[in-house]
Amino acid sequence: MSETLAIYGGTPAVDVTKVVNWPPVDKTDEKMVLDALYAQVQTYGKHNMAFGEEFAKWNGNQYALFTNSGTAALHMCLVGCGIGAGDHVLVTAYSWSSSATCILHHDAIPIFVDIDPETFLMDPDKIEEAITPRTKAIIVVQLHGLCNDMDKINAIARKHGLKVIEDACQAHGALYKGRKAGTLGDCAAFSFNQNKCLSCGEGGMFVTNDEEIYKGGAKLWSFGEIARPDERRDYHAYALGWMYRNNELTAAFGRAQLSKYDFYFNTLRDNGEYLLKNLAGTPDLLLPYEPEYATHNWYNFNLRIDFDKMHITDPEEQIAFRDAVAAALRDEGIRASVWQRFILPEMTVFAAKNAYGMGYPWSIPGADEGVDYSLEKFPNALAYSRKHISIVQTLRAPNGLDIAEQVRQGISKVFNNLDKIDPERIRKILEDRMK
């Protein structure tokens, strides 16, 4: 293998012609989707019902409702837990925007909590100091497919009378002390979009073991109506509702993919463990951390650059160097990306405190008391946003250890040549490609 970086003209480490795209589709998917295609019912049909039932059984939930997105499922969780206008909800400072915009959907206020620098998850030791008199719930984001310390978080929630909502949108099959994500709080949301470990293109799942939470959240699913999917509709809006239903084709694809998910999960586990073992000791590379209590699903395998050892302290220099390293990894044939460049309090929708105009919902009398989005409160989240690189999809099934080894070679090649990474040169190379 050439040690000249591929971005400078060397041979890529990964033979991308051997990498199977995600999600893999076979006859099982074709048969299920064609069955839905030729059915006379495209909504409220058998596949929607069956997907919810099969997912609930697989994951260990009593109730599950298939939605059109993970964001929709998160909104349903909040409503099911009785969150309303002016309430406060704790959430990590680093995640996808939906983890916090879902709070705004029902006129509540996000209260951000900094992350643990090793797990990248909300720091449980910072939760209590963030609780305000208006706090009603904690959204625990099982980010990148890793579960947080749920015993500690649930104990805090019980002490303060708070609901616990799992954002498990990336955590299909991830475990906490042997229990699956989505069963560790009062309710949970999953996502099935293109990038997820379990994908049907787009979609989500609202799950809970609490009948009252299910009934409350389900009102949003279909225009505020209360009929279950298997019951006759009366077309009466009993509450403010959205249109969060999904269709039969997507549900059928989801069912087929779920039937293969244990294989997908085990493949990801094997590939992730292989990289952890065989990249140990790579210079200036910080590998992801898996606590003893957790079983990661490796939705994202996150690399971090050890800027402390490299003596790069300026944030802008860190970002430019990280972006150049990510570009070099991509040219080696690795699907590497910067998953989220901004921490949530940095995003305009939160920083401006003006979601709906006239400062709403922060302008609700008393709602903004104790709400501080100053970026200096979130040093760990800021630091992480500047130095991480995510590997997505390349490690997914059916790609096995042969591909994982090529990925390892590509990562080793780039990190053993960090002295040759010239951010300005790489920026110009990328610009020239766009011409």
Where are these regions (language model features)?
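N-terminal "arm"/small-domain region of PLP-dependent enzymes with the aminotransferase-like
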Residues: 1-41, 391
